């Protein structure tokens, strides 16, 4: 059954932090599905595309990413198909592949504009959009706007009790590095220490996520020339 195939591919794409050596075959299968499958359950199909895209992004598989964007565009043309979140994700995906910074920033802003009311169902998405926009502002020399959107993304995770999910790790790590660049390393360290505690509570101190946070802490201590502390965190 097509449902079983879609489900199994989605499960692979949602396995956090796990890379597979057969990713090319996986993406070819996804491409064949886009081309050949009968799309009779549109919400499920859209969700499939939206879960596969970030996994392709991990491998910089631009051919497949472009195919997914085109497919989403085709499906979301009629206003009665898809949700505000689907449309926001399409714009976010377009921003991912956009080379011009001003255009990418506009696409992320348009993505945020799609969602009028933030709810428990879309808070994670809105938080990610703010984080992405903050990252673009940071890379393009707009520290005040970067700070505004990064802080908004983290406050949404906090507000909706989502700080323990995997999305929070790159968001808080990037924010901590940004604070260090802005000569506020103590605040960055404090944010990462809080995150370490949350990961330890919800998961363990023996997982990849915990190690990533320790690595970021070590990097910040290295940047601030605190070698003993840097060594401690790199060892963890």
Question: How would you name each of these model-derived features?
Answer:
Residues 47-58, 85-99, 124-139, 150, ...:
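Conserved alpha-helical positions within TPR/SEL1-like repeat arrays
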Residues 5-44, 48-55, 59-80, 104-114, ...:
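Amphipathic alpha-helices of TPR/Sel1-like and other helical repeat/solenoid scaffolds
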Residues 13, 53, 80, 95-98, ...:
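Short coil/turn linking the two alpha-helices of tandem helical-hairpin repeats
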Residues 38-40, 78-82, 117-121, 159-163, ...:
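Short coil/turn linkers that connect adjacent helices within long alpha-helical scaffolds
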Residues 4, 25, 41-44, 64, ...:
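Structural signature of alpha-solenoid helical repeat junctions
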């Amino acid at each position: 059954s097509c449902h079983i195939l879609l489900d199994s591919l989605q499960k692979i794409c949602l396995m956090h932090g796990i890379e597979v050596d057969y990713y090319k075959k996986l993406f070819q299968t996804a491409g064949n599905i886009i081309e050949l499958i009968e799309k009779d359950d549109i919400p499920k199909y859209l969700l499939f595309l939206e879960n596969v895209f970030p996994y392709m992004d991990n491998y910089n598989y631009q051919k497949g990413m472009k195919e997914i964007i085109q497919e989403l565009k085709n499906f979301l043309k009629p206003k009665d198909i898809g949700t505000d979140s689907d449309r926001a994700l399409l714009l976010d995906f377009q921003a991912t592949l956009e080379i011009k910074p001003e255009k990418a920033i506009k696409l992320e802003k348009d993505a945020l504009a799609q969602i009028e009311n933030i709810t428990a169902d879309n808070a994670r998405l809105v938080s990610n959009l703010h984080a992405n926009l903050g990252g673009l502002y940071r890379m393009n020399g707009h520290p005040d706007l970067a700070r505004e959107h990064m802080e908004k993304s983290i406050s949404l995770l906090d507000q909706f009790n989502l700080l323990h999910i995997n999305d929070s790790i790159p968001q808080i790590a990037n924010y901590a590095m940004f604070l260090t660049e802005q000569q506020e390393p103590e605040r960055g360290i404090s944010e990462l220490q809080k995150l370490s505690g949350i990961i330890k509570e919800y998961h363990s101190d023996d997982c990849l996520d915990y190690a990533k946070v320790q690595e970021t802490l070590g990097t910040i201590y290295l940047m601030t020339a605190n070698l003993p502390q840097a060594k401690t965190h790199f060892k963890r």
